[in-house]
């Protein structure tokens, strides 16, 4: 009798369901997080441990192999341009849906559980004191090793790109250095596969803690907001990304099926970082050049948070409607412009979505205290927007590869179809 092997997606789904069941049974029990939180934190720490080495080694291999700085500069300009266009679409879609469905009308926000947001207020104050020039100046590190310790991804990318260009410029003398980082890259992707073996346990622990703390009751008073956010994110995922994928020559449904393991893991953990290494590996498998993948995806984690900005635009109008504040078209245009800036400038800040909302609400006259009432359901919405964020960045690698004339859609479709067949065969044993 053949041994039945379950794929990673199935294992994670089982962990997710068991976590929900345990969280519901022990809802409000302070002892549960004491036992489960360390397990979830351990899994997240294992992932964060390998993200920076993978980004650095992959970026060096990709950029040094790409050649001159002119090519890298062109790719950088096109990437940022694409990110700005797609995130602007997300903001406008969020505002349009909030205006049509009015999720905040008739909601008594005081029925919702109030949460502590003081940490986000302090972070917002720190960030608001920085000028736009200071924000962009921060991209260039004064000490690369300090940036590594702090996990400052933009500063790390800046140094790594320059270092890779230096390796490329010295020709033969740079080959041993390049070979070293190729070895690092291969080794780290092997470590990723090892870490993924404990992913179902991490998901079980994280979901169990979340449900035990917030329960399902908080969904009732803020159900309209949560429902609209999920509908909006699903629309963006299928329709907007579907159009982008079609232009790139692939099917969005095959693309999503190809990434189902990563999508389920990101949804369960509310963390894009947990799947960054696997997303990079999978985009290379469907034909995206390593240089483009290692450049576009890490930068996208800072500049291309489509799910987050879509949520932020809906949440801002939701709070305005709750407080009975009528926002004119000019207020909403201001909101679009402010979100376009703040969502980029604060992308590496902990609790980004809340910090961005705090920075934005004041510009349109909406009381920031309202965020304390929606904080209780933020984790539930964060799960969905994380999926859109990671899908957007994976798709961006495909778009940039296509734009550079280095992507074969037919080959990609074949690889994605083969992958689905192999996964099904694994599950059926």
UniProtKB/Swiss-Prot annotation:
The lineage of its organism: Bacteria, Bacillati, Bacillota, Bacilli, Bacillales. Keywords: Amino-acid transport, Cell membrane, Membrane, Symport, Transmembrane, Transmembrane helix, Transport. Its main location: membrane. Residues 27-45, 101-150, 212-224, 268-290, 343-353 are extracellular. It is a multi-pass membrane protein. GO terms for molecular function: symporter activity; transmembrane transporter activity. GO terms for biological process: amino acid transport; dicarboxylic acid transport. It comes from the Bacteria. The keyword Transmembrane applies. Pfam families: SDF. Induction: In the presence of glutamate in the medium, the expression is reduced two-fold, at high potassium concentration (5 mM). In the absence of glutamate, the expression is about two-fold increased at the increased potassium concentration. It is found in: Cell membrane; Membrane raft. This is Proton/sodium-glutamate symport protein. SUPFAM superfamilies: Proton glutamate symport protein. One of its GO terms (cellular component) is plasma membrane. Residues 1-5, 67-79, 172-190, 246, 312-321, 375-429 are cytoplasmic.
């Amino acid at each position: 009798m053949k041994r039945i092997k379950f794929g990673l997606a199935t294992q994670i789904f089982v962990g997710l369901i068991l976590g929900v069941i345990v969280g519901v049974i022990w809802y409000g029990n302070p002892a549960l997080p004491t036992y489960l939180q360390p397990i979830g934190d351990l899994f997240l720490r294992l992932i964060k441990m390998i993200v920076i080495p993978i980004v650095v080694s992959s970026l060096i291999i990709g950029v040094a192999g790409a050649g001159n700085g002119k090519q890298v500069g062109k790719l950088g300009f096109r990437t940022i341009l694409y990110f700005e266009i797609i995130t602007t679409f997300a903001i406008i879609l969020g505002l349009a849906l909030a205006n049509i469905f009015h999720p905040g009308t008739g909601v008594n926000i005081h029925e919702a559980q109030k949460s502590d947001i003081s940490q986000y207020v302090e972070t917002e104050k720190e960030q608001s004191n920085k000028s736009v020039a200071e924000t962009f100046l921060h991209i260039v590190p004064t000490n690369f090793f300090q940036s590594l310790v702090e996990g400052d991804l933009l500063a790390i990318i800046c140094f790594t790109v320059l270092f890779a260009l230096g390796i490329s410029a010295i020709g033969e003398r740079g080959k041993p250095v390049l070979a070293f980082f190729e070895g690092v890259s291969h080794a780290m992707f092997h470590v990723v596969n090892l870490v993924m073996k404990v992913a179902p346990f991490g998901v079980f622990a994280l979901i169990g803690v979340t449900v035990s703390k917030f329960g399902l009751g908080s969904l009732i008073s803020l159900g309209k907001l949560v429902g609209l956010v999920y509908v909006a994110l699903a629309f963006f995922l299928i329709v907007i990304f579907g159009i982008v994928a079609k232009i790139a020559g692939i099917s969005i449904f095959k693309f999503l099926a190809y990434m189902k393991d990563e999508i389920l893991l990101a949804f369960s953990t509310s963390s894009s970082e947990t799947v960054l290494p696997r997303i990079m590996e999978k985009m290379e498998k469907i034909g995206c050049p390593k240089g483009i993948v290692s450049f576009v995806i890490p930068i996208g984690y800072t500049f291309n948070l489509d799910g987050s900005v879509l949520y932020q635009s809906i949440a801002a109008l939701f709070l305005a409607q709750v407080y009975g504040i009528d926002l004119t078209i000019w207020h909403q245009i201001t909101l679009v412009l402010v979100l376009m800036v703040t969502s980029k400038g604060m992308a590496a800040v902990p609790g980004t979505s809340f910090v961005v909302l705090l920075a934005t609400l004041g510009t349109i006259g909406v009381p920031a205290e309202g965020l304390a009432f929606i904080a209780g359901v933020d984790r539930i919405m964060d799960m969905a927007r994380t999926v859109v964020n990671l899908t957007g960045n994976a798709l961006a690698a495909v778009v940039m590869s296509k734009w550079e004339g280095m992507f074969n859609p037919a080959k990609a479709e074949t690889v994605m179809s083969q992958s689905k067949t192999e996964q099904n065969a694994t599950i059926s044993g």
